Regions:
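A conserved helix-loop-strand patch within extracytoplasmic ligand-binding domains
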Residues: 114-163, 262
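Short, polar/charged alpha-helical segment
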Residues: 40, 47-70
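Ligand-binding clefts/hinges and TM-proximal coupling segments of bilobed small-molecule sensing domains
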Residues: 148-173, 253-288
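Short, low-complexity disordered leader/linker segments with a strong preference
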Residues: 1-40, 283-288
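Beta->alpha turn/N-cap motifs
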Residues: 75-77, 87-101, 118, 192-193, ...
């Protein structure tokens, strides 16, 4: 399987812009149609275990249906949805439902979830502390800058007793302005989610989304707290709205519901074995 590293530099943007005005837009559409007809598909992922999930748990079933799968690596949460909406890729696996729906609404994108997958929750990590009880007055706490994961991080910190939020706040939209109790006057530092694991030496604790924690080699056994994923916070395979009921959408959903996928998730030594299971999985397989 080929992997592509998506790196957007200013020069590349300029080249792409020139290409658009030269008529590359129509060529791209033709290529997209050709890919679909030949069952060549591109699936976008972010740093973490979900590229491995495509390769180890999803690809085999798709290959049996005649697909050729190419994984496209992105470095942030923004590009994969934009690339999906524009037709540059055919699906992505890198975000939960709450983030997907908010990003799609905010950016007027027609992208939809087709199925949830087992997902690693966020963790609270530190290079300096062995317990949250060791937090001192004025310590810095790194949390993701994007609105959805920021709210998710605050909710986790509240669950762990570090802070308290307004009782009537929508937990999916909470901000630092909604913190009503912060006994240790903690200073919240917002960073791109991918940067937090690399910034633990400059803060007391950091809340790292599961995929980035795994990509950084962080050990969840040493985490100071681990998120129990609420409904809507398990990662999903997303496609364009037009593909939800298409052959591609149905085949991607079937791949996740397949025996091959189940075996890859549950086998001894699987990196996905401890991931939170979606509701459909529990209904189908129980606690396996």
């Amino acid at each position: 399987m080929k992997k592509i590293k998506k790196i957007l530099a200013l020069g590349l943007v300029s080249v792409l812009a020139i290409g658009i005005f030269a008529g590359c837009g129509s060529k791209s559409n033709d290529e997209g149609k050709s890919n679909k007809d030949s069952k060549d598909i591109k699936i976008g992922v972010c740093p973490g275990p979900y590229g491995d999930m495509v390769e180890k748990a999803i690809e085999l079933y798709l290959q049996s249906l005649g697909y050729k799968v190419e994984v496209v690596d992105f470095t942030d949460y923004v590009q994969p949805d934009q690339a999906l909406a524009s037709g540059e890729i055919d699906a992505n696996l890198m975000q939960h439902t709450v983030y997907l729906e908010k990003f799609a609404e905010d950016n007027n994108l027609d992208i939809k979830s087709i199925i949830e997958v087992p997902t690693a929750g966020a963790g609270v990590f530190s290079e300096k502390l062995k317990s949250l009880d060791e937090l001192k007055d004025g310590d810095k706490v790194a949390i993701p800058t994007d609105a959805v994961n920021l709210a998710r991080s605050l909710r986790l910190l509240e669950t762990l007793g570090v802070i308290k939020l307004k009782e009537d706040v929508d937990a999916t939209k909470a901000t630092t302005a909604d913190v009503t109790e912060n006994k240790k006057n903690l200073e919240f530092v917002t960073l791109d989610a991918a940067q937090i694991s690399r910034s633990l030496d400059s803060v007391a604790i950091g809340v790292v989304p599961g995929n980035y924690a795994i990509a950084a080699g962080l050990d969840f056994n040493s985490a100071l707290g681990v998120e129990k994923l609420a409904e809507g916070y398990k990662n999903v395979i997303a496609v364009r709205g037009e593909d939800v009921d298409s052959e591609l959408g149905k085949d991607l959903k079937a791949a996740v519901e397949s025996e091959e996928f189940f075996n890859a998730i549950t086998e001894d030594g699987s990196e996905f074995k401890s991931f939170d299971r979606p509701d459909w999985w529990t209904a189908k397989y129980g606690d396996k």
